[in-house]
Curated annotation (Swiss-Prot):
Gene (name only): CPT2
Protein name per UniProt: Nerylneryl diphosphate synthase CPT2, chloroplastic
Record-stated family: Belongs to the UPP synthase family.
Region forming the signal peptide: none
Cross-referenced Pfam families: Prenyltransf
Keyword Metal-binding belongs to the record: yes
Organism: Solanum lycopersicum (Tomato)
Catalytic function, reaction form: 3 isopentenyl diphosphate + dimethylallyl diphosphate = nerylneryl diphosphate + 3 diphosphate; isopentenyl diphosphate + dimethylallyl diphosphate = neryl diphosphate + diphosphate; neryl diphosphate + isopentenyl diphosphate = (2Z,6Z)-farnesyl diphosphate + diphosphate; (2Z,6Z)-farnesyl diphosphate + isopentenyl diphosphate = nerylneryl diphosphate + diphosphate
Predominant subcellular localization, coarse grouping: plastid
Its EC number(s): 2.5.1.142
Length: 314
């Protein structure tokens, strides 16, 4: 039986067995919160009239859980997004995409979209702190973004200076990863002052990836290890995963959840090593429109997944 026929029969049987009234056809289009919560538990005991291995059923179950924007909740009120406190991701990586498209859609200059980075990140930090999230790593400017027009790059560099001045007294700890030496000197000074001033802040840690790329991070870590080995500071036999991670610029646990706004579904050279076992969530919402409801939806989606880290929990 080919995979498309198996999937079709699977969803028909699932609809009947679980009494999912919102499924009008053989594939899920909209599902209520209450219906979604118990699906995975019921899948384990569901008897389907299919000739399929347990592994095949698990694959379809996983495929179902990985739907992001395709599973639409019937009620979008924030209060109805019941998050489990014990399953809140400790570290969220954030690709803030869609600022330029947001501005263009409103007939504005692209700079107007970029300007919203500061208030929007403040909002996300405030919500994240209340939810118990410990770290937010936000992708602000990549090593490839230098290819943009000089006017846009100059505007962004000035905007980042304003950003760090704003976050001096916002109450969160701020640190920067990326190649700072290539940034304007005035921006480097703003970064140094903000990192020093906020290093003692408790609670949320906001990491800004600025002139950062995953390739760059892996290469600089490799060069550092090679240099130490050549100077007799470590033996080649001592090189392992833990040692390598100590040389990466991110000095905190790897992200549990990656959120990318703006509809694109790729990581764009962001935290390539660190995202090995991170759960991905992609949303069509443009970053300037991304708010509390959207963040909670992403976290709820994360909480409904089975994180196996290469193992098997079924």
């Amino acid at each position: 039986m080919n995979s498309s026929i198996v999937s079709q029969h699977f969803f028909i049987s699932l609809k009947s067995s679980l009494d999912l009234q919102c499924w009008k056809s053989s594939s899920p289009s909209s599902i209520s919160m209450g219906e979604f919560k118990g699906i995975h538990d019921k899948l384990q005991i569901l008897k389907l009239p299919l000739t399929m291995s347990d592994r095949g059923l698990s694959k379809i179950s996983c495929s179902l859980s990985l739907q992001t924007e395709k599973l639409r909740y019937d009620n979008d009120d924030n209060d109805d997004l019941e998050l489990h406190e014990e399953l809140i991701p400790k570290h969220i990586a954030l690709i803030m995409d869609g600022n330029r498209r947001w501005a263009k859609a409103k007939g504005l200059e692209v700079y107007e979209g970029h300007k919203l980075i500061i208030p929007k990140l403040k909002e996300i930090c405030d919500i994240s702190s209340k939810l118990g999230i410990q770290v937010i790593t936000a992708f602000a400017f990549s090593t490839e973004n230098w290819k943009r027009s000089k006017e846009e790059v100059d505007f962004l560099m000035q905007l980042f200076e304003e950003f760090f001045n704003e976050f001096l007294r916002f109450g969160v700890r701020v640190s920067v990863i990326g190649c700072k030496s290539n940034l304007p000197m005035t921006l480097q000074k703003c970064i140094a002052l903000t990192e020093e001033t906020t290093k003692g802040n408790k609670g949320l840690h906001l990491v800004i990836a600025l002139n950062y790329g995953g390739y760059y991070d892996i290469l600089q870590a490799t060069k550092s290890i090679v240099n130490k080995a050549m100077n007799g500071l470590l033996d080649v036999e001592d090189i392992n995963k833990n040692l390598f991670e100590q040389e990466l610029e991110s000095k905190c646990p790897n992200p549990d959840l990656l959120i990318r706004t703006g509809g694109e579904q790729r990581v764009s050279n962001f935290l390539l090593w660190q995202l090995a076992y991170t759960e991905f969530y992609f949303t069509n919402t443009l970053f300037p429109d991304f708010g509390e409801k959207d963040l909670k939806k992403a976290i709820l989606n994360f909480q409904q997944r089975h994180r196996r880290f290469g193992g098997h929990t079924y």
